[in-house]
Regions:
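Ribonuclease/tRNase effector modules and their secretory precursors
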Residues: 1-92
Length: 92
């Protein structure tokens, strides 16, 4: 679970984001794909927050991550705070 990385840092998942991933039947591998292959969201987010969108067919998937310090692992990591799917996103 903690072997998936983005920009060299591991990705941890918040409880709510884990529920969203399970609901959509997706894994951290899918999150990494969105972060690496997706495009920046047109929304403004707080400094240090990254939101990426990826179009797949008629659906657009989005992932929101923030950089944080993981107390158990004793290292910086990304925390997935939101994962979602919607229709009618920007066509890039």
């Amino acid at each position: 679970m903690f072997n998936d990385r983005y920009k060299g840092l591991r990705i941890a998942v918040s409880d709510s984001a884990m529920r969203e991933l399970i609901k959509e039947g997706k894994t951290l591998y899918d999150v990494v794909e969105i972060l690496e292959d997706g495009y920046d969201s047109p929304r403004k987010r707080k400094f240090g927050t990254i939101e990426k969108w990826l179009n797949k067919g008629k659906k657009t998937y989005n992932a929101v991550i923030i950089k944080d310090y993981h107390e158990i692992l004793k290292e910086e990591c990304w925390v997935l705070t939101h994962f979602g799917k919607f229709t009618g996103g920007n066509k890039k």
